[in-house]
C-alpha cells in the first residue's frame, strides 16, 4: 500500500505573498453547531482541510443536507434525524466531540464514538462531562468504544471549570443554548475561537454574553434560526507562516491576519530579532529573515499567552539563535514527539516529557527521513526541511493536511523546492 510523502530540498529563500485560511479550531466547532439551527446556514471562509470534510460527513449521517464548495458550506437541517455517529469517522478527529454538545442541545440525547485526533498525551474530556451533568444529562460510559449522553430536560447551571479548556467551554455552550434558564461558565477559555463560536450562535438567535472573558453567560432560547457567517482567520496557520518567513523568507507578506490574535508570537519573534512589520489596518504582516537570532525562552500558556500550537513550529528558528533557548510546555507536556525527528536531522535538542521542558542549542540541519507524529509536529518538520541542507522526506503527512490548506502549493508559490511523491 502506497502513501504520500512530502519532499523538500532545503536552502531556498522564499519570497511573495500568502493568504491565511479560516480558523481550523473555529470551523471544527461551528460546523457541528449548525445542527442547532432550524433552517439554512451558510458558512464562508472555511479552511480546505480534511477535518472539515470529516465533520461535513458526520452532518450527513444525521440526514442533514450539507453542500461543501471550496471555502463555503451550505447546511439545511430541515430533515435532521438523530442517529448514532460511527466510530470510524469520530475516532479520526478529536473535535468530533463537539457533536456531543450540539446533539445534546438539539435532541437531548446522543450516542457517539469516542473522539481521536492527534496523539498529544492525555487530553481527557472530564470537564465536558462535568458540564453536561450539571445541565441535567446522564452519561453512560459502559461501552469501551462509545458514549451515550441523555437528558430528560436541560436546565441552566453554574459551572466552574477546574482547568481552562477551549473544548469544554465550547461544548458546554453548545449544549446550553436551548437549556431552560441561565448557564454561567466560570474559568471559561478566552481564545478567539471561543468568541467566534459564540458570535456564530448569537447570529442564529442565541443569547450569549461574556465571550472572550473568564465568565460566560448563556440564556437559553427556544429555537435558533438560520444565518450566514464568516469564520475568523486562522491564527495558528498565520503563526506558522510567520515562523516560515522568519526562517527562510527574503520578504514574505502574510495576508488576512488579526494582529491581536498573533500578538504573543509577534512579541517573541521581535525578541528573537526578526524583522517584522504588522499592519493592523490592512490585516497583514511583512517579515524578512535574518541570518542569526538571539536565544529566547518560551513558555506556552492559554490565550492571550504563547499558543501551545506554535511551540513546535517556532522550534526550528531557535536552531538559528546565538545560544541555548529553553521551552516550557504547560498545556501538553508530552508535546515533544518532534524532538527525535529533529535529532535525525542533526539538531542539538533535548526534551523531558515529564517536566514539559526542552533545551534547544544552535544547530545546522541536514535532510533526513522523518515522521510527523501530529499536525503541528508536521509543520515544524516542514520548516526544518526548508532550513536543512539536502532533501528531507516527511511521512505521515495526513496529519499535516488535517490543519493546513494547500501548504505544499503555497510554499511552491513562495519559491520552495517542495513536492509530493507516492512511496
From Swiss-Prot:
Which SUPFAM superfamilies does this chain map to? EPT/RTPC-like
**Which Pfam families does the record associate with it?**
EPSP_synthase
UniProt subcellular location: Cytoplasm
Q: Which domain of life is it from?
A: Bacteria
What is a GO molecular function of this protein?
UDP-N-acetylglucosamine 1-carboxyvinyltransferase activity
Enumerate the residues binding phosphoenolpyruvate: 24-25
UniProt-listed Enzyme Commission number(s): 2.5.1.7
What residues make up the catalytic site? 118 (proton donor)
Residues annotated as carrying 2-(S-cysteinyl)pyruvic acid O-phosphothioketal in the record are 118
Record-listed UDP-N-acetyl-alpha-D-glucosamine binding positions: 94, 123-127, 309, 331
Q: In which pathway does it act?
A: Cell wall biogenesis; peptidoglycan biosynthesis
InterPro entries, A to Z: Enolpyruvate_Tfrase_dom, Enolpyruvate_Tfrase_sf, MurA_subfamily, RNA3'P_cycl/enolpyr_Trfase_a/b, UDP_GlcNAc_COvinyl_MurA
> Would the keyword Cell division be found if you checked this record's keyword annotation?
yes
Q: Give the Gene3D superfamilies listed for this entry.
A: Enolpyruvate transferase domain
- Reaction(s) catalysed by this chain's protein: phosphoenolpyruvate + UDP-N-acetyl-alpha-D-glucosamine = UDP-N-acetyl-3-O-(1-carboxyvinyl)-alpha-D-glucosamine + phosphate
Q: Which UniProt keywords apply?
A: Cell cycle, Cell division, Cell shape, Cell wall biogenesis/degradation, Cytoplasm, Peptidoglycan synthesis, Pyruvate, Transferase
One Gene Ontology term, aspect cellular component: cytoplasm
Q: Which GO terms describe its biological process?
A: cell division; cell wall organization; peptidoglycan biosynthetic process; regulation of cell shape; UDP-N-acetylgalactosamine biosynthetic process
Give the family from UniProt.
Belongs to the EPSP synthase family. MurA subfamily.
Question: What does this protein's UniProt record list under function?
Answer: Cell wall formation. Adds enolpyruvyl to UDP-N-acetylglucosamine.
What's the name of the protein? UDP-N-acetylglucosamine 1-carboxyvinyltransferase 1
**Organism name:** Staphylococcus haemolyticus (strain JCSC1435)
**Gene name for this UniProt entry:** murA1
Amino acid at each position: 500500500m502506497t502513501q504520500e510523502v512530502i519532499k523538500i530540498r532545503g536552502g531556498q529563500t522564499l519570497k511573495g505573498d500568502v493568504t491565511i485560511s479560516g480558523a481550523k479550531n473555529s470551523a471544527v466547532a461551528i460546523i457541528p453547531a449548525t445542527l442547532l439551527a432550524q433552517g439554512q446556514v451558510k458558512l464562508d471562509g472555511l479552511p480546505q482541510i480534511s477535518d472539515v470534510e470529516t465533520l461535513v460527513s458526520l452532518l450527513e449521517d444525521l440526514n442533514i443536507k450539507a453542500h461543501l464548495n471550496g471555502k463555503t458550506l451550505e447546511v439545511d437541517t430541515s430533515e435532521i434525524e438523530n442517529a448514532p455517529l460511527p466510530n470510524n469517522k469520530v475516532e479520526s478527529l478529536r473535535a468530533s466531540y463537539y457533536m456531543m454538545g450540539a446533539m445534546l442541545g438539539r435532541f437531548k440525547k446522543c450516542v457517539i464514538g469516542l473522539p481521536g485526533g492527534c496523539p498529544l498525551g492525555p487530553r481527557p474530556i472530564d470537564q465536558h462531562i462535568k458540564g453536561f451533568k450539571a445541565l441535567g444529562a446522564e452519561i453512560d460510559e459502559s461501552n469501551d468504544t462509545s458514549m451515550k449522553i441523555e437528558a430528560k430536560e436541560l436546565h441552566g447551571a453554574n459551572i466552574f471549570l477546574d482547568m481552562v479548556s477551549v473544548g469544554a467551554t465550547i461544548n458546554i455552550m453548545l449544549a446550553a443554548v436551548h437549556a431552560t434558564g441561565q448557564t454561567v461558565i466560570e474559568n471559561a477559555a478566552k481564545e478567539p475561537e471561543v468568541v467566534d463560536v459564540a458570535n456564530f450562535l448569537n447570529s442564529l438567535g442565541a443569547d450569549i454574553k461574556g465571550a472572550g472573558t473568564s465568565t460566560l453567560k448563556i440564556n437559553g432560547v427556544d429555537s435558533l434560526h438560520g444565518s450566514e457567517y464568516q469564520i475568523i482567520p486562522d491564527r495558528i496557520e498565520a503563526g506558522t507562516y510567520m515562523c516560515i518567513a522568519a526562517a527562510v523568507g527574503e520578504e514574505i507578506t502574510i495576508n488576512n491576519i488579526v494582529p491581536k490574535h498573533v500578538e504573543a508570537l509577534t512579541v517573541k519573534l521581535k525578541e528573537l530579532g526578526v524583522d517584522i512589520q504588522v499592519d493592523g489596518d490592512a490585516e497583514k504582516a511583512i517579515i524578512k529573515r535574518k541570518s542569526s537570532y538571539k536565544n529566547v525562552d518560551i513558555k506556552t500558556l492559554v490565550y492571550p499567552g504563547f499558543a501551545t500550537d506554535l511551540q513546535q513550529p517556532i522550534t526550528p528558528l531557535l536552531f538559528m539563535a546565538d545560544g541555548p533557548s529553553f521551552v516550557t510546555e504547560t498545556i501538553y507536556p508530552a508535546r515533544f514527539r518532534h524532538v527525535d525527528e529533529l535529532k535525525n536531522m542533526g539538531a542539538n535538542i533535548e526534551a523531558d516529557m515529564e517536566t514539559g521542558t526542552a533545551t534547544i542549542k544552535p544547530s545546522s540541519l541536514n535532510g533526513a527521513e522523518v515522521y510527523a507524529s501530529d499536525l503541528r509536529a508536521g509543520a515544524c518538520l516542514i520548516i526544518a526541511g526548508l532550513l536543512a541542507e539536502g532533501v528531507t522526506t516527511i511521512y505521515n503527512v495526513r496529519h499535516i493536511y488535517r490543519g493546513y490548506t494547500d501548504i505544499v502549493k503555497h510554499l511552491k508559490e513562495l519559491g520552495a523546492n517542495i513536492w509530493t511523491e507516492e512511496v
